[in-house]
Structures are given as structure tokens and as C-alpha cells.
Amino acid sequence: MSYVEEHGEANLIGAGPAMLADVVAGRRFREIAEPTADGSWTIRDEVLFPAVSDCFPHRLLLANSDRMRALSQPVPMPTWPDVHRLIVQLTTTGVEVDRSVGAVARLLAAMDREGLLEPVSEPAADLDHAHMTFLGHSTVVVRSATAAVIVDPWVRPACGHYPADYQPLQLRDLGRIDAVVLTHSHPDHFDTGTLLQLPCDTRIVVPKLERETFLSVRMYERLHELGFDDVTELEWWDSVQVKDIEVTALPFHGEQPTDGSQLHPDIRNAGNTYFVRTPRCSAAFLADSGRDAAGDVRQVAARARRDLGSPDYLFVGYRGWLMYPVQLLTSSVGRYLPFVPPESWGVRQRIMTTADEAVDIAEIWKAPHLVPYADGGAPWYWQIGLGPRLDEAASENPVFDPFPERVSVAAATRTKTGSGVHRSTVNVLLMRPGDSIVSGGPQPRIERMQNFAWPYGEATAAVADAAYLG
């Protein structure tokens, strides 16, 4: 980061290969990797496969809604299920707190002493009628008449820095949740602080992973440590039933160290994408997927259309993350860098799907409605550096954190002929955090909650210059 501050990111990219060569030649890198005869290296097994017994949840971090008071409390490993039950009780209205467990009583006393116990608000609205509710970033609730499944739950606390009538939705606002579906173990998709607010017997579906690695948390094991007792590992193309909702796991390609070959190709950011079908609609959730040496999300879309049919709604991450390997140093996935082979150091990588590719996928899958997501979308995200700003200070990095309107522009400018610019038949739905789809059919209706209205304008004007993306 100091190099970027002094010389600028453009110079970092140009100097990247030489800088990375110096790093690889250094003593500290040799502590994690062995050089090979071809000028590459092999990462040591103890790095590739961390000892799970040495890495366990040992501390609970708590803060009040405005982050002015905080508590860091040690939690002995055997007491996590008791602490989990306490958190559920504290975040649920009308539930009496059980103070009979010693560890729980001590934690409550510490929270009270630090002023961290606040009244729990009543649910914001009755959302049981909604087919789907978008909470922001990658979090979506899918409902049938009898069940509800939440994808990648990540809720943020209320805060005085946000508009008074536009605060983050909480789990208690969503009604009954029958199951959780997790795509991968990056912290903006696998948020234990949110998950601990759900009862211990909540069903959770996670990707199949035999062994925890440097790039992937084995969520099955970690969730059991926290007290969850109904966790299912689901392999690609397998399905589970949650009452009348069917959840099918699909391959997760992309968001790997490179979009081509990598060192230790078996060590991946392991994940699932999902096709979720209810009696009244269907949706697919592609999270941060894209393409890599093992496959391409567009191939997944083609097979899924044959095997499962077309989803009514396709939720696609569109961030692109077009970057050179040295830029990983300034990203949230710097740990990818040891897996990038030297011949790729000077080659730009496409880590995720771009806006234009999102429309490609929808056309291949024959999905009538495309929802851009997985890029923040509200102040509680962009204030921590996730996603573009969509308020009056609207700003974006088009190749890293673009406006969601970029997907609308991509759909409206698919090709150009002598008669003009031609659009896709795919309908792009721009959903804001708190929006719900409340009716099906060819023109679904988006409903915004009362007292939870989007307080900002639209960013379409900011991308009007992109009349044709090509």
C-alpha cells in the first residue's frame, strides 16, 4: 500500500512482475514454498492445509449500533453452543433470556457493563407475501407459501450514519427462515455474526469440501463448532428439498487466483452456485462466479437450462474484477497471489463476471429477468469499501466496482448495425436493498417497504456516456 500511495497504482501494475520476482526470491517466501527446477515453486503442505485444531473460534466481538462501544470476550470452545443460543434470544423479540449457564451469565454481565444491551425493535414489515426479498449485496430470501430459504445471509447493524428511514434490514424483519444456503466461504458470503442470530437447529446447506485449505474454509465443520446441528454438504448437480422449495447446487467457477492455469489447481475457492425452485417461481444465484481453467459459468448456464430449465430470475454478480496479479496485494484476496504462476504476472485476469457477460449468461440460460447483485448496494456496504457509492456522491470503478446500471446499459447495447444499436430481450431488474418481488408473470412487480424507501437517485445518468460497450 505504501508503494501505491507514493507512486500510484498505474506504476504498481507496470512494476508488478519485477516486484513479485523479488518477493518470490526472498527469505520470507521460502518459509511457505519450495522452489522448483522450472523457476516456479511448490507451496508447503502445512500452508495448503492448515491444522484445523490450531484454528478455532475463540473470541466474540460485539459492538453497539453506532460502533462507539465494543467488547471482545473470550469464549471457551465447548461453550459456543450456549453463547449461540444466547445471541438468538437477545436478537429475537418476546424471548426470555436463559441466564442459568455460567458462561452466558458472565457474557451478559460484561455486555451490560459496556452498555451493549439495547432494546430489540419490532419487525419492520410483514414480508411473507413476497416471492423474493433482496437485503443487499448477495443476500436474498426466497419464499413459497410454506417455506423460506435465505441465500448468503449478511446483515449489518443499524447506525446513525445512515438515513433515519433507510437502515439495514435485520433477520427478525424477514419472518420465519427454514434454511440457509451458502455459496462460498469468503466473509461477505459466510458471515458468522449473522448466522449466530439463527437458531441452532436451522438447516444450512454448504458446498462439499473434504478438507479445509488455505483458500477455503470447511463451513460444515466450522458451523458445527458454533452449535449448528443440521448442516448439509451439497455436491454439484445434487438437490435437497426444504418443504416445497427445491435447492440444486451448481458448479462455482471463477473467483480463483487466475482465470486460467494456476499453481496447485486442486486448491480452490470452493463453492456452489444454486438453482432454487418454488411452486410459484424459480431463481438462480451465481454469486461471484465467472470462469477459470476448470470451467465457465456460461457452460453451467447451458447445461442447467437443459437439465433444470430456465430460471424466472437470474441473480448475477457483475463486478468483473479485471486486474493484474500484483493488484491482489491491495484486495481482500491477497492470499491468492502465491497460486499465480510467474508467466501470468503480467497478464490481466478476469476474476469475476462482467456486466456484458452477465447478459450473455441470461441469454444462454434463457432467463427472462436478470438482477445484478453481489456488489454492495447501500451505505452500510460502500462505507466499508464494498461496491460503488450510489448516493449524491456517486462514484465507481467501472472495472472493479461498477454501478449496477452498467448491466442495464450492457443489455440495451448488445450489438450495432447500420440501423442502430440493438438491445437484448433480457429484462434487467435493478433491485435496491429492501426491495421485494411480489408477483410473477412477464412483468414482475417490485415492492418497496413502507418506511424503508430508497433515499438516493438513480445512477443511470452517470453511465449514459457508455452508449455502446462493444
Walk through the language-model features, giving the residues of each:
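Binuclear metal-ion centers of metallo-dependent hydrolases, dominated by the metallo-beta-lactamase
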Residues: 1-35, 224-243, 329-470
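Pre-active-site segment of Zn-dependent metallo-hydrolases
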Residues: 2-81, 110-127, 141-185, 192-197, ...
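Metallo-beta-lactamase
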Residues: 104-127, 209-281, 414-434, 438-448
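Active-site-proximal beta-strand elements of phosphoester/diester hydrolases
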Residues: 131-134, 148-152, 246-253, 282-289
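Structural motif
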Residues: 147-149, 178-179, 203, 245, ...
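Active-site environment of divalent metal-dependent phosphoester hydrolases
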Residues: 158, 186-190, 211-214, 235-241, ...
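Active-site-proximal loop/helix segments of hydrolase catalytic cores
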Residues: 193-194, 256-365
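Short internal beta-strands
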Residues: 201-213, 315, 368-372
